[in-house]
């Protein structure tokens, strides 16, 4: 298959996706997407269709003799299309659930970490900090490697968001560590006084 044929097939796929979900453009999607596919979660359908179109445009404007570049972007585009379609199908089949129940479940899972004992919570914070560090480095590297200015800016902005979140996580770790040291000192003092 030539590059031109590949682009035509991908263009058809994107057009089919647009036609299938044209009426749902303003619907919000609450699925969590892989950050390598979409830049944000919780956006409306038109946002994701726009990002799919940006990937298609990148393929159309790509000037490379290496077929791996085209394959990589084509696979990304197809993955974007399929996860968006799956999310829309899932959303439409689960419309019978009440939204308040869903919101309560999300809120409970977000706050469940705060109900853990301090030492277990600290472990979760360490894991989160490590993940945020990795995401920061990954997006910083992507920003440096990216040729397209818009994409470079987007990756740099995402890297900054991860850096700020990492700093908040570090602040929470510091505070929790201080608390645990303080608690240990108080317990040691009480133990020596009781002897």
UniProtKB/Swiss-Prot annotation:
InterPro entries: PriB/PriC_sf, Primosomal_replicat_PriB/PriC. Gene3D superfamilies: 1.20.1270.340. It holds the Pfam family PriC. Keywords: DNA replication, DNA-binding, Primosome. The keyword Isomerase does not apply. The keyword DNA-binding applies. Disulfide bonds: none annotated. Involved in the restart of stalled replication forks, which reloads the DnaB replicative helicase on sites other than the origin of replication. Recognizes abandoned replication forks and remodels DNA single-stranded binding protein (SSB) on ssDNA to uncover a loading site for DnaB. There are several restart pathways, the PriA-PriC pathway is a minor restart pathway. Part of the minor PriC-Rep pathway for restart of stalled replication forks, which has a different substrate specificity than PriA. Part of the major restart pathway with PriA, PriB, DnaB, DnaT and DnaG primase. Belongs to the PriC family. Monomer. Component of the replication restart primosome, which is composed of PriA, PriB, PriC, DnaB and DnaT; DnaG primase associates transiently with this complex. Interacts with the C-terminus of SSB; this interaction is required to load the main replicative helicase onto substrate replication forks. Interacts with helicase DnaB alone and in the DnaB-DnaC complex, probably 1:1 binding with DnaB. This is Replication restart protein PriC. It comes from Haemophilus influenzae (strain ATCC 51907 / DSM 11121 / KW20 / Rd). The lineage of its organism: Bacteria, Pseudomonadati, Pseudomonadota, Gammaproteobacteria, Pasteurellales. The gene is priC.
């Amino acid at each position: 298959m030539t590059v031109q044929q590949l682009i035509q097939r991908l263009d058809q796929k994107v057009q089919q996706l647009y036609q299938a979900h044209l009426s749902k453009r303003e619907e919000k999607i609450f699925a969590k997407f892989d950050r390598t596919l979409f830049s944000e979660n919780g956006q409306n359908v038109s946002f994701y269709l726009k990002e799919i179109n940006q990937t298609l445009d990148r393929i159309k404007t790509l000037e490379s003799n290496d077929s791996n570049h085209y394959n990589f972007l084509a696979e990304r585009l197809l993955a974007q299309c399929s996860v968006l379609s799956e999310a829309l199908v899932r959303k439409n089949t689960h419309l019978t659930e009440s939204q308040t129940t869903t919101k309560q479940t999300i809120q409970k899972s977000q706050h469940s970490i705060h109900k853990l004992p301090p030492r277990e919570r600290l472990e979760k914070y360490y894991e989160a900090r490590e993940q945020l560090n990795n995401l920061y480095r990954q997006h910083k590297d992507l920003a440096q490697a990216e040729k397209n200015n818009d994409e470079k800016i987007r990756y740099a902005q995402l890297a900054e968001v991860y850096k700020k979140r990492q700093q908040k996580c570090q602040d929470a770790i510091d505070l929790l560590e201080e608390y645990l040291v303080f608690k240990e000192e108080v317990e040691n003092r009480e133990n020596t006084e009781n002897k």
